[in-house]
């Protein structure tokens, strides 16, 4: 199930970010991506909160939690079908073909490839949220209350993403990226040394700040560096 979930995330992520870049003026692109991150993360905050309440009320009925989680996904599909208007293609349909072509790859400049390398390095330093939950259990948090850690992370992420996005529109993108990396290092250190649930919560909060500072920013930088007709690629 987790594997299929990651496939779904991979499919939806690129076209979603490309669509935002297509319909947003460049001068407010950081704020737009920040707002998108905030709204997306509200679900990550409300979801664990609801899961925790359901687990407590149903004596850890995991099956019911997953059935309830299906409903927001269905609503999202309906919104895409009936509420999202896709911009016109930049090329005639007859010219649309597989993007994995050598001539297309040559159109990405050095800035873009440096961003790809940076994102790859950041991914190596940022472990899965599953390990964060395991860390919470490791220091003694009961399984019913483990989602609290995700609530802390996503609450901080949601509250910080839009302000960080606005800041990046004011010419602070390089500084914001550096501070985002510093926050990731700090989070990893706190979680590695944590001996109680309070320090795990602090590490999760710092991780949320890192996500708020970098996730939307990386999308903005890619949108700025990539040719308009290859942003989804």
List each language-model region with its residue ranges:
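Symmetry-related core transmembrane helices of the 12-TM Major Facilitator Superfamily/SLC fold
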Residues: 64-81
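Juxtamembrane intracellular "pre-TM" segments in multi-pass secondary transporters
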Residues: 86-118
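Helix-to-loop junctions at the C-terminal end of transmembrane segments
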Residues: 55, 160-172
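Short amphipathic helix-loop junctions that connect adjacent transmembrane helices
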Residues: 130-149
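Cytoplasmic membrane-interface "Motif A"-like loop-to-helix N-cap segments
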Residues: 170-181
